Amino acid sequence: MTQNIITVKKEHIIENVISKSRFIAHIKPVQNEDEAKAFIAAIKKEHKDATHNCSAYTIGPEMNIQKANDDGEPTGTAGVPMLDILKKLDVHNACVVVTRYFGGIKLGGGGLIRAYSGAVRDVIYDIGRVELREAVPCIVTLNYDQTGKFEYKLASTHFMLRNQTYTDKVSYYIDVVKSDYEAFINFLNQMTAGNFDLTEETPKQLPFDIPTE
């Protein structure tokens, strides 16, 4: 069975200003260490005039690979605190780079730790996390007179509506976690008295939103 993992929704950037220093946090989901290294290199190239480009990443369902780099900041004040936030929020397969433009005021060790870890926490909170779960992409096609009740009830379930299209009928693109598939079929039967068309695609790892606490 494929293990579910948590990562970030997509690439994202936020900026914090602390004591006149700019801390720009860039985060991206990655599949392997090569992708992480390429992302770090791209950010360093984009911000080659920055004072520091500190980085951290985790790879694998068990975070088998964990790397952190202070990029010239005092040892333990940037990369490791950044990595600690990834681990605390259980974010796998993600790379984060925090770019610092020094503003002339020294923050001290504690201040740096708070600034770098805070930037990582903020960028994750801002974009949000997803859980990659093995799911079945489904297309459910209904007559127009069935849609009102169906949509109302669907909104109160955990089945993930991705899209819907309208022709002579209405098609709903819904992702269903494999373990919930039988319950989904029961739901369809209850809502339509068995009057529906269903197309199933090959199961795959799909993202489902989860709260960031």
Can you describe what each PLM-predicted range is?
Residues 36-39, 116, 150-153, 184-187:
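Hydrophobic side chains in well-ordered alpha-helices
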Residues 141-159:
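Short amphipathic alpha-helix segments
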Residues 47-50, 157-161, 190-197:
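A common structural junction motif
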Residues 78-127:
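Active-site beta-strand/loop microenvironment that shapes enzyme catalytic pockets
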Residues 1-76, 181, 197-208, 213:
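C-terminal regulatory domains involved in ligand/effector binding and gene-expression control
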Residues 174-183:
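Terminal, non-globular segments
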Residues 128-146:
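Short glycine-/aliphatic-rich beta-strand segments at the starts of folded cytosolic domains
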